[in-house]
């Protein structure tokens, strides 16, 4: 039920802020916004010997299948326009699921410049090349905890690729 999920999301984000304010503030401060032209900055900072895995399971299950001391970066298939997607409205897609099991929403909601820019630059639903890198997001499942870095990035809306009329105005 979406009303239950919405109420749970509000409770969860408040609880995260109360219990993890210093960790959230640290992640917000160290988060980075990347837009077209900054890929060079990313590649300069890439460590050698990265291990990439594609696993057939949900993102948080994959995270907890790894050793607790693993340094992991997760991809958040995000809303281009809203931090945490429709989390506070009770939706439950991948972006919302990540927020329900972490303090990711608390970090993303502080990225007001990013979301102000993205809401003004929707490119008719095809969006722009942009992402947020958020380090050290704490995830919870059962009685376990695991930190992971998160890249929040939205894919273009497939329906807009074939739509002759823009869904959003610039």
Residue ranges with predicted function:
Residues 1-170:
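Macrodomain-like recognition of ADP-ribose-binding/processing modules
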